[in-house]
UniProtKB/Swiss-Prot annotation:
Misc. remarks from the entry: In the reaction, the free carboxyl group of octanoic acid is attached via an amide linkage to the epsilon-amino group of a specific lysine residue of lipoyl domains of lipoate-dependent enzymes.
Family from the record: Belongs to the LipB family.
Catalytic activity: octanoyl-[ACP] + L-lysyl-[protein] = N(6)-octanoyl-L-lysyl-[protein] + holo-[ACP] + H(+)
Residues annotated to bind substrate: 96-103, 168-170, 181-183
Active site residues of this protein: 199 (acyl-thioester intermediate)
Gene encoding the protein: lipB
Record-listed E.C. numbers: 2.3.1.181
Name of this protein: Octanoyltransferase
Main subcellular location of this protein, as a coarse class: cytoplasm
Length: 251
């Protein structure tokens, strides 16, 4: 049985119409923050703190980051999906939905810190918009990809790697606001995926864009992906805050 990557707590995210005579609350442009290479725990703590302290006036943000090697296990995840206990890669238990996945250099990780009530977004709609953004990004590099019913993420559509997973997603919804997000494999060491059942699926092949013979620049793909996410969310221009450049890493 598949496990949803979305974990919902507290208030539901469905939004009713504004009271009669009350104007709709405008949706502010998304601020994009490029956080560089950052330890997973630092990103995890920061997005929880951001979500816990945000108010109705807090703007939505998208964080783009690259993590050192780490496995993350969702709150309902089964530790048995970590097949090699002494792999040398740390395991962090987190509060998103879903099972186990791997993050590492050469992978784009995007966290979506969104007020779903203000945006009048149902969770399923948000997941669809995220998946569409990844599919559109890969299409920009002439890679055909698809979603699978009951198995959130994005998969290779055809060829020798048909059915292999190239992107994963997992969200947490708290008080109508999302955090966590998605990961897209660009050019990375894929061997750590062999030590897990990716997203809880035994034998699931995981690939990156390089495996599909696409020599893509990490930063270029990241900018394409963020652009598609914003366009799919609301079509607004992002207010990009770039405190330091992300470094491409192929190790």
């Amino acid at each position: 049985m598949s496990v949803s990557p979305v974990s919902i707590v507290s208030t539901p995210v469905a939004v009713s119409a504004s009271p009669a005579g009350a104007p709709d609350q405008p949706v502010q442009p998304v601020t994009v923050r490029w956080r560089g290479r950052e330890a997973y725990e630092a990103s995890f703590d920061a997005m929880r703190a951001f979500t816990d302290t945000r108010t109705a006036d807090t703007g939505d943000e998208i964080w783009v980051v690259e993590h050192p090697p780490v496995y993350t296990l969702g709150q309902a995840g089964d530790p048995a999906h970590l097949l090699v206990a002494d792999s040398g890669v740390p395991l962090v238990k987190v509060d998103r939905g879903g099972q186990i996945t791997y993050h590492g250099p050469g992978q784009i990780v995007v966290y979506l810190l969104l007020d779903l009530r203000r945006r009048k977004l149902m969770v399923r709609t948000l997941v669809t918009k995220i998946e569409e953004a990844v599919i559109e990004t890969l299409a920009a590099y002439n890679l055909a990809s698809v979603r699978k019913a009951g198995a959130p993420g994005i998969y290779v559509a055809s060829g020798v790697h048909e059915g292999a997973k190239i992107a994963a997603l997992g969200l947490k919804i708290r008080n109508g606001c999302s955090y966590h997000g998605l990961s897209l494999n660009v050019k990375m060491d894929l061997r750590p995926f062999l030590a897990i059942n990716p997203c809880g699926y035994a034998g699931l092949e995981t690939v990156d864009m390089a495996s599909l013979e696409v020599a893509a620049d990490w930063n270029d793909v990241a900018h394409t992906l963020v652009g598609r996410l914003i366009a799919n969310l609301d079509g607004a221009s992002a207010a990009a805050d770039k405190p330091h450049a992300l470094e491409q890493s192929n190790d």
